[in-house]
């Protein structure tokens, strides 16, 4: 999909603030600093549309990015950051749960994991949560350019085993630096959002 116009439509903290356009939505989930904003920026070919930060836990709202009035990317607050207060973590969790379990236009979820490390207990819990609610999920292993090519198949296999990936879900190795995995991720997004050939 060639993206021409991108705008941050809404930064929401409650369901009443969600867009009412009815366009399909894809949510991006992952631990703090896993590379969500970098992935989104690469996919939409913008250097700084989604705000990247060296500070974990920076995203504290559901950020809805409108792509050509056809599709929303939803940047979800990162999980697993210990320095965020328990109160803030509980607030984030409730906000994310409400969105994932009640949002009609949501077509699928991109779950990001760091390819340099095994999926964490938080990653495993999140994947199990997504499967419990039968949400279509793509696992994207970020920062794959940091891993030697000879070890990448092993990385993908390790992620599949650790998450106990079901047969309908897949792992795509991705690098925001080199663009590896870009076309494969977009292919999944278009198919999942029902935008193939449109």
Swiss-Prot record:
GO molecular function terms listed in the Swiss-Prot or TrEMBL record: GTP binding; metal ion binding
Cysteine-cysteine disulfides: none
Cofactor(s) this protein requires: Mg(2+)
Keyword check for Magnesium: yes
Superkingdom of source: Bacteria
Binding site for Mg(2+): 37, 59
Biological process annotations from GO: division septum assembly
GO cellular component terms, semicolon-separated: cytosol
Pfam families in UniProt: MMR_HSR1 (PF01926)
InterPro entries hit by this protein: G_ENGB_dom, GTP-bd, GTP-bd_ribosome_bio_YsxC, P-loop_NTPase, Small_GTP-bd
Keywords: Cell cycle, Cell division, GTP-binding, Magnesium, Metal-binding, Nucleotide-binding, Septation
Binding site for GTP: 30-37, 57-61, 75-78, 142-145, 174-176
Domain EngB-type G, chain residue ranges per copy: 22-195
NCBIfam families recorded: GTPase_YsxC (TIGR03598), small_GTP (TIGR00231)
Annotated HAMAP family: GTPase_EngB (MF_00321)
Family per similarity comment: Belongs to the TRAFAC class TrmE-Era-EngA-EngB-Septin-like GTPase superfamily. EngB GTPase family.
Function text: Necessary for normal cell division and for the maintenance of normal septation.
Protein name: Probable GTP-binding protein EngB
Organism listed in the record: Lacticaseibacillus paracasei (strain ATCC 334 / BCRC 17002 / CCUG 31169 / CIP 107868 / KCTC 3260 / NRRL B-441)
């Amino acid at each position: 999909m060639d993206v021409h116009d991108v705008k941050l439509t809404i930064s929401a903290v409650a369901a009443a603030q969600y867009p009412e356009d009815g366009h399909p939505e894809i949510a991006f989930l992952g631990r703090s600093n896993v590379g969500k904003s970098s992935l989104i920026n690469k996919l939409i070919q913008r250097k700084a549309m989604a705000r990247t930060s060296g500070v974990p836990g920076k995203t504290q709202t559901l950020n809805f990015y409108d792509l050509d009035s056809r599709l929303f990317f939803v940047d979800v607050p990162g999980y697993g950051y210990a320095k965020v207060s328990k109160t803030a973590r509980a607030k984030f969790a409730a906000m994310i749960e409400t969105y994932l379990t009640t949002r009609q236009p949501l077509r699928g979820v991109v779950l990001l994991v760091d390819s340099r490390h095994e999926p964490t207990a938080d990653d495993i819990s999140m994947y199990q949560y997504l499967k419990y609610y039968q949400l279509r999920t793509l696992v994207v292993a970020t920062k794959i350019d940091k891993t030697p090519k000879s070890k990448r198949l092993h990385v993908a296999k390790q992620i599949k085993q650790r998450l106990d990936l079901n047969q309908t879900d897949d792992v795509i190795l991705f690098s925001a630096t080199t663009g590896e995995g870009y076309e494969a991720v977009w292919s999944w997004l278009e198919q999942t959002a029902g935008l193939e050939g449109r």
